[in-house]
Regions:
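Conserved C-terminal "lid"/linker of ANL adenylate-forming enzymes
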Residues: 326, 353, 388-436
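Conserved AMP-binding/adenylation subdomain of ANL enzymes
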Residues: 142-157, 165-206
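AMP-binding/adenylate-forming catalytic core of the ANL superfamily
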Residues: 306-400
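Conserved AMP-binding/adenylate-forming
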Residues: 31-71, 155-164, 332
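Conserved pre-ATP/AMP-binding loop-to-beta segment of ANL
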Residues: 2-6, 101-119, 151-159
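Gly/Ser/Thr-rich phosphate-binding loop
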Residues: 219-274
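Conserved AMP-binding A3 loop
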Residues: 18, 107, 115-142
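Conserved AMP-binding/adenylate-forming core of the ANL superfamily
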Residues: 4-35, 90, 132-135
Length: 436
């Protein structure tokens, strides 16, 4: 972390909060945690700047942090069993407020071993609890910093559509700006309009977002073109090449994709639709099945991913998840490749391809844009599906053409842009009309 930041620099805006006052508040909370001998707290903050302050306080006091993905009953129980209390915006306003102000701001140790427990949402199966340390998170943030083309400086405002409760949000929305000296936008902005509005809070802005949101950007919006936008960072899935290139060309802003996971942290980056470049602290290779393994400075051991890849000297090309490379007949079909091809169709806003829950065939769950909905209504379902299959046959084997189709206006992706298996299965098992 940048311990030498100007004390009058800002940590956030609207309202402004100076770095010196931010550190003082962190010291007060740390002192209170030590006084009460608190071993573990769970976080649930709306304000990311308050989250950052409470996080530094916990690092300084050695208090474990629990990050639930949501506050559903099972996570409430997890918090009750493993944390002394839930730390939120309301509690922050008065917790430790009576503690004395330190004469000198503390030096925050980037080698600190305080634990962060991240609980996954379980969207792809059983929820997992992953343990990180403060040292590992700082190391990862430094590697991210070295991989990005953006400068340090207090004039840059980091605006985000992702939650701080997940690893992606924690790394990029909290840890990275603390290293870079950027200001942290307080509120998560899940829609393009909010990101645009918040971007005007500072001389320059950088967005942390996802392919799902970036595909919804209206590149003809005059206000978007007026944004003091330096660039965007996208993760949580593959950004369609035409979308990324259109943003780069029309907004004259860098669009950087990050590849990684909660288990591995950041792995690699790319600034176009080409090969992935691992961080300077990351080594990669392939196992016997052709799936990528990762060994980074912040990992306790080598992590095996489920993503197929091809290596090209010090870079690599992703082929899609091994479990999403399925054999239909005698052909190996990449479900991710079908998605990428289908996303190029002018009617398609979003899509997810998986094996049908009953029949051994690809099934396509497709969100249509306005042109797509209009064409669906004009052509009728059968002719509409035929057109999409005809489009795909240019790039796909016949066995890779989806046999089953469901059409909606929006896919129910979670905050990490993932589709849950139960949602997908329900869409194809339920006998109902397309939701258009």
């Amino acid at each position: 972390m940048n311990n030498l930041r100007d004390p009058n620099a800002l940590i956030t805006r609207h309202p402004d909060w100076q770095w010196q006052d931010f550190l003082t508040r962190a010291c007060q909370i740390s002192a209170q945690l030590k006084q009460e001998q608190i071993k573990s707290v769970a976080f649930w903050f709306d304000d990311a700047a308050l989250f950052a302050c409470a996080m530094l306080a916990c690092f300084h006091s050695g208090t474990r942090i629990l990050l639930p993905p949501n506050l559903l009953s099972e996570n409430q129980q997890w918090i009750k069993e493993n944390a002394d209390f839930l730390f939120d915006d309301t509690l922050f306003n008065h917790y430790g407020i009576a503690q004395k102000h330190p004469e000198n701001p503390p030096h925050f140790d980037c080698h600190d071993s305080t634990e962060i427990w991240l609980k996954t949402s379980g969207s792809s199966g059983q929820a997992k609890i992953l343990v990180k340390t403060a040292r590992q998170m700082w190391l990862e943030a430094e590697a991210i910093h070295q991989s990005l083309p953006f400068p340090q400086g207090n004039h840059i405002h980091l605006v985000s559509s992702v939650s701080v409760q997940h690893h992606y949000g924690l790394s990029y929305r909290i840890m990275l700006p603390l290293i870079m000296g950027w200001t942290i936008a307080r509120q998560q902005q899940p829609y393009p309009e909010g990101l645009i509005e918040e971007s005007f809070a500072a001389p320059a802005s950088i967005w942390i977002s996802s392919p799902t949101l970036l595909t919804r950007l209206n590149l003809d919006d005059a206000k978007l073109h007026q944004c003091p936008l330096l660039g965007m960072i996208s993760s949580g899935g593959v950004l369609p090449a035409d979308i990324g290139n259109a943003i780069r060309q029309q907004l004259k802003a860098d669009v950087i994709e990050c590849y990684g996971s909660t288990e591995t942290g950041a792995i690699a980056f790319r600034a176009d639709d080409g090969l992935w470049q691992p961080t300077t602290m990351t080594k990669v290779g392939l196992n016997s099945e052709g799936a990528l393994w990762v060994d980074s400075a912040w990992l306790n051991q080598r992590e095996q991913t489920a993503d197929g890849a091809e290596l090209f000297e010090d870079k690599f090309h992703l082929l899609g998840r091994i479990d999403r490379i399925v054999k239909f007949g005698d052909k190996r079909i990449s479900l991710v490749k079908i998605e990428q091809d289908l996303l190029r169709h002018p009617w398609v806003a979003d899509c997810y391809i998986a094996q049908h829950p009953v029949h051994f065939r690809p099934a396509a769950w497709v969100a249509l844009n306005l042109d797509g909905i209009q064409s669906y209504q004009q052509l009728g379902r059968s002719a509409f599906v035929s057109q999409l299959r005809h489009f795909l046959i240019k790039t796909q084997e016949h066995s890779g053409l989806p046999r089953f189709w469901r059409f909606v206006e929006t896919l129910p992706r979670n905050s990490q842009s993932k589709i849950s298996k139960p949602d997908f299965e329900q869409a194809f098992l339920a006998e109902k009309e397309d939701a258009l």
